[in-house]
């Protein structure tokens, strides 16, 4: 008998930065990957060439979320994991209607994972004890709050709470955890002054890069016991 093909890992927002790094990590392990993307960055073509299934999706509406879920349901009979990496960053600022800011942040960080977890639940079940995973990417600000990104922090806090609720709902077949990062890597346009200020916010005074996230994701995927937890990835920032 031939070797059974592994079930794919679904990564939302997999076209750039951490999502892209995770996609390549799994591809290099011969792990099938399904990636959602909103904007067709050149990196998407590389993922497709490497064998990833890339599905364009618009998570700004519930209809867009459910249309994406339908595409996933058509494409596979099961999932190894869902990594909710898709995110947006919007501040309260003059000229931006507060209702729009809150609605946008809640849509991408709460509605989207909530609807996808429900719609794709059957793809995660039936594979054995602790055989499947959901990982929510939240944020360090869940613990501290943010005076400049109030809606963003609130939406990530709601996602953090959903981690525990879905862990209760889906155990023991599916483990559900969240990762709460602070600074992981800089943007190309960040200047030296900003970078130094950001580094000084943590005890470790470094931006560790995508590998730190990948290692933590691997830990959660291989654990048979950890569920309903938020794992901080902040370099001791809470002690500053």
Curated annotation (Swiss-Prot):
Q: Which InterPro entries match?
A: NAD(P)-bd_dom_sf (IPR036291), Sc_DH/Rdtase_CS (IPR020904), SDR_fam (IPR002347)
Q: Which residues form the signal peptide?
A: none
NADP keyword on record: yes
Q: Does the keyword NADP apply?
A: yes
Per UniProt, what is one GO molecular function of this protein? Answer: dihydrofolate reductase activity
Instruction: Give the matching Gene3D superfamilies.
Output: NAD(P)-binding Rossmann-like Domain (3.40.50.720)
UniProt catalytic activity: (6S)-5,6,7,8-tetrahydrofolate + NADP(+) = 7,8-dihydrofolate + NADPH + H(+); 7,8-dihydromonapterin + NADPH + H(+) = 5,6,7,8-tetrahydromonapterin + NADP(+)
Q: What is its EC number?
A: 1.5.1.50, 1.5.1.3
GO BP: any one term:
one-carbon metabolic process
Could you tell me the keywords of this UniProt record?
A: NADP, One-carbon metabolism, Oxidoreductase
- Residues in the active site? 152 (proton acceptor)
Family note:
Belongs to the short-chain dehydrogenases/reductases (SDR) family. FolM subfamily.
PANTHER family to which the protein is assigned, alphabetical? DIHYDROMONAPTERIN REDUCTASE, OXIDOREDUCTASE, SHORT-CHAIN DEHYDROGENASE/REDUCTASE FAMILY (AFU_ORTHOLOGUE AFUA_5G02870)
Record function comment: Catalyzes the reduction of dihydromonapterin to tetrahydromonapterin. Also has lower activity with dihydrofolate.
Q: What is this protein called?
A: Dihydromonapterin reductase
Q: What is the lineage of its organism?
A: Bacteria, Pseudomonadati, Pseudomonadota, Gammaproteobacteria, Enterobacterales
Report the gene name: folM
């Amino acid at each position: 008998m031939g070797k059974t093909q592994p079930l794919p890992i679904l990564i939302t927002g997999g076209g750039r930065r951490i999502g892209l790094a995770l996609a390549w990590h799994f591809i290099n392990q011969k792990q099938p990957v399904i990636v959602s993307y909103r904007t067709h960055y050149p990196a998407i073509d590389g993922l497709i060439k490497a064998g990833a299934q890339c599905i364009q999706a618009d998570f700004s509406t519930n209809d867009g979320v459910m249309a994406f879920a339908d595409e996933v349901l058509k494409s596979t009979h099961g999932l190894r994991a869902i990594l909710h990496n898709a995110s947006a960053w919007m501040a309260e600022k003059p000229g931006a209607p507060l209702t729009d800011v809150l609605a946008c942040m809640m849509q991408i960080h709460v509605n989207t994972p909530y609807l996808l977890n429900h719609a794709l639940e059957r793809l995660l079940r039936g594979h054995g004890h602790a055989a499947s995973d959901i990982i929510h990417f939240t944020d360090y600000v869940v613990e501290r709050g943010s005076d400049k990104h109030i809606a963003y922090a609130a939406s990530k806090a709601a996602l953090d709470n959903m981690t525990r609720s879905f862990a209760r709902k889906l155990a023991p077949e599916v483990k559900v955890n969240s990762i709460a990062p602070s600074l992981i890597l800089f943007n190309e346009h960040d200047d030296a002054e900003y970078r130094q200020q950001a580094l000084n916010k943590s005890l470790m005074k470094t931006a560790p890069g995508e590998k730190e996230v990948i290692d933590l994701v691997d830990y959660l995927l291989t654990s048979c016991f950890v569920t309903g937890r938020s794992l901080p990835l902040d370099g001791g920032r809470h002690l500053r």
